[in-house]
Amino acid sequence: MSKLIIFAPQCGGNHLANMIGASQNLDNCLNLQEIELAYQNDKNASHTHMNEFFINEMISYTVTIKNNSIYVGHLDEVWNNWDRLKDKIKDVLVIDLSKKAQETIRKNKITYLESCSYTKEFIEKLFPNWNVESIHLDDLFGNADMLKFILDGTSFSLDNRCVKLHNIWLKKIKDSK
C-alpha cells in the first residue's frame, strides 16, 4: 500500500512528501542527499515533487500507483482519481487549514472553503476507507524538531536528517516574501 498527502496549493505538500519519502526510503522518492542538493541548487526544487508522485499525473492514466510509495495532490485531484486510488492508498496525511494560519506563505489567502475542506474530519468523511492523519499548516511552516515530534508515531514519521532540509526550505520561503 502507498501513502498520500492532501494539501491546498502553496501549503508545502510537495516539500513534506520529499522529506517523508526520503526518510522512509519509499520507492518513488529520491534520497535525502539528492533532495538536499536539489534544494540548495534549484530555487524551485523545494516547491515541487522531486520524482513521480503528483496525483494530477494520474488523470492521464499513464502513471500507475505503486506500492511502498508516496503521492501528493489537491483535494479535487484526489476526488477525481478516487476510483484509481481507493484500493492502493492506505494512509493519508492532510495539511489542515482549519485554524487561522499565522506566519505562513498563505497568510490571508486561505479561503473559507479551504478552511472547511482541508481538515482531518472532512477527509475522513469523504474517504472513509483510509487512515487519515493531519498536521496543521502552521506546524509545517514551523520548527523542524516540532514537526518531527508531531509526525512521530504516525506512518508519516521523519528521519532526524530532515531537520537540515526543512531549514533550507523555510529559509527559501522567508527569503521569497
Predicted regions and their residues:
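The conserved 3'-phosphoadenosine-5'-phosphosulfate
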Residues: 33-44, 109-112, 118, 122-177
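PAPS-dependent sulfotransferase catalytic domain
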Residues: 1-108, 114-122
